[in-house]
A protein has these predicted regions:
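Basic, amphipathic alpha-helical segments enriched in Lys/Arg and hydrophobic/aromatic residues
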Residues: 271-307
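Phosphate-backbone recognition surface of nucleic-acid-processing proteins
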Residues: 194, 199-272, 276, 302
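A residue-level signal for conserved active-site and pocket-lining positions in enzyme catalytic cores
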Residues: 100, 134, 248, 273, ...
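Phosphate- and other anionic-substrate recognition elements at nucleic-acid/protein interfaces
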Residues: 1-158, 256-257, 278
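Helix-hairpin-helix/helix-loop-helix acidic hairpins
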Residues: 142-195, 204, 259
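Short helix-capping/linker segments at secondary-structure and domain boundaries
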Residues: 107-112, 141, 205-209, 255-262, ...
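Short alpha-helical scaffolding segments that buttress acidic/His motifs in well-ordered protein cores
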Residues: 103, 125, 200, 247-252, ...
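Generic structural signal for well-ordered, non-transmembrane alpha-helical segments
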Residues: 132-135, 139, 161-168, 285
Length: 307
């Protein structure tokens, strides 16, 4: 096995490999990635680890997948915690690449291999990203409107109108993709609206392929122990995919009002003395478990059908 760590920046890729001194820097461009992938393809059983860097790593990941290379994308917090555990408190691109290489050498068997999204999933993810940007801009403009004097207020109102039109257009494009690819499992409970469906399809492809505990940990709604000796700390959620968790939270808020099963579960938890937010997170976990199980059944039915 040859471990490879790649630190990704907007302009450059810093590459550290087992058995090779120093770090190689290549351009984070189509030509630079092609050259790097050709080099990596010649290595013996390469295990490549890349840190998530706000989307700048996606072209590299997809090129590696197209070439049949094993590559994993790790959370920046995981990488930073690993660096601290290794005793490296300094941070440079070269140091980060070396530490990612060390992580690949030590933990390749525990890291999840990256699977490239299908073209429609990539398109849906792009629409979701833009939708989030527009929603954030709308919230900011609404807050600013209260402080705007008369002449500026009319200009701000035009901006709000334009943003609302763009949001409607984005939702329309997303709905076209949902009509083509959403399955009954994703709309099997009240509260599972278009945003949750789109987020699940684009950002949670593992839905239905994992058991209930694994999917809860992946999304970040599993209660984590905090025990030491004779003390037993409160269980808390942490980590996971924030975008999916936000969409699940909003879906659960609606579900505990309108879905009879979820409403009864929430009321039962509150009657047992659970805090409102604790009960809501438990409902998030239950809703995710239900959708995951129904999606699993769909996948089994699809696999059983003759080709």
């Amino acid at each position: 096995m040859t471990a490879v760590g790649i630190d990704v920046g907007k302009a450059f890729l810093d590459v550290a490999m087992d058995g090779r001194p120093g770090v190689v820097r290549v351009a984070n461009s189509a030509a630079g990635i092609r050259k790097l992938v050709r080099q990596l393809a010649g290595l013996a059983e390469a295990r490549i680890v890349v840190e998530a860097t706000g989307g700048y790593e996606e072209a590299l990941l997809e090129a590696c997948c197209d070439a049949g290379l094993w590559v994993a994308r790790v959370n920046p917090r995981q990488a930073r915690n690993f660096a601290r555990a290794a005793g490296d408190v300094a941070k440079t691109d070269a140091i980060d690449a070396g530490l990612l290489c060390l992580m690949a050498r030590m933990f390749a068997d525990r890291l999840q291999r990256y699977r490239a999204p299908l073209p429609w999933q990539r398109e849906l993810r792009d629409w979701l990203r833009r939708r989030g940007q527009v929603v954030t801009a709308l919230q900011a403009h609404r807050q600013q409107m209260a402080m705007c004097p008369g002449p500026i207020r009319s200009l701000a109102a035009r901006t709000l109108t334009a943003l609302r039109r763009e949001l409607a257009a984005i939702d329309q494009q997303m709905q076209l993709l949902l009509d083509a690819h959403a399955t009954p499992a994703l709309c099997s409970c009240k509260g599972l609206g278009p945003v949750f469906q789109a987020t699940s399809l684009a950002l949670l492809p593992e839905l239905g392929a994992l058991d209930r505990r694994q999917i809860a940990r992946l999304v970040g709604v599993a209660p984590m122990n905090r025990d030491s000796g004779q003390s037993s700390g409160a269980r808390r959620i942490r980590g996971g995919r924030a975008s999916v968790r936000v969409a699940l939270y909003m879906a659960t808020l609606s579900a505990v009002r309108w879905d009879e099963t979820m409403k009864a579960h929430y009321k039962q938890l509150r009657a047992r003395g659970k805090l409102a937010k604790v009960a809501l997170v438990a409902c998030m976990r239950k809703l995710l478990t239900i959708v995951n199980a129904r999606r699993r059944d769909e996948l089994l039915q699809e696999a059983a059908q003759p080709a």
